[in-house]
């Protein structure tokens, strides 16, 4: 009888041991390597960082916006580490020198061709169970934004030419230019 093969369970220490320049995320003890983002991806990250940051500054808000690479430790068991494209954190006690301990309030992921299932399925489930309040999946190929508001248990889709209301702020919406 063949013995059952156990898959290795990795921790944050394995992520820290990666060679310089190599980026990966850790979800439930499994390492997912990340390819370098393309120009369109980086432009979208910059756009969202600027729009959200400007809004927070205008409102003298307490939240902070962090673009990738920024470490998010979703729980304390050291088997979940992600680098969302955009993280908005409203609880200053979650922010440390190493990143964010616990769920950000709002996460935006920009879909790349090689990571669609990560953003649409794996991270969707992980972010919901970790306590993220709002999760946007921005798909440049489809020119669509899928918005999950976990507290209200809603999902809505918007095209890039529509204003997308931000659930964690009552008076803020974003239209992708």
Where are these regions (language model features)?
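Gly/Pro/Ser/Thr-rich low-complexity, intrinsically disordered segments predominantly at protein N-termini
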Residues: 1-177
């Amino acid at each position: 009888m063949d013995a059952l093969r156990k898959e290795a369970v990795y921790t944050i220490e394995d992520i820290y041991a990666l060679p310089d320049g190599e980026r990966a995320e850790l979800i439930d003890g499994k390492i997912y390597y990340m390819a370098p983002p393309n120009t369109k991806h980086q432009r979208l990250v910059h756009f969202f960082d600027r729009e959200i940051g400007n809004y927070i500054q205008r409102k003298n808000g307490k939240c902070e916006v962090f673009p990738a690479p920024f470490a998010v430790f979703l729980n304390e068991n050291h088997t979940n580490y992600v680098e969302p494209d955009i993280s908005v954190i409203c609880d200053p006690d979650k922010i440390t020198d190493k990143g964010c301990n616990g769920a950000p309030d709002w996460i935006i992921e920009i879909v790349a061709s090689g990571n669609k299932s990560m953003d649409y399925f794996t991270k969707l489930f992980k972010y919901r169970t970790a306590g993220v309040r709002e999760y946007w999946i921005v798909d440049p190929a489809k020119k669509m934004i899928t918005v999950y508001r976990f507290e209200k248990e809603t999902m809505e889709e918007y095209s890039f030419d529509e204003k997308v209301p931000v659930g964690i702020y009552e008076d803020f919406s974003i239209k992708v230019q």
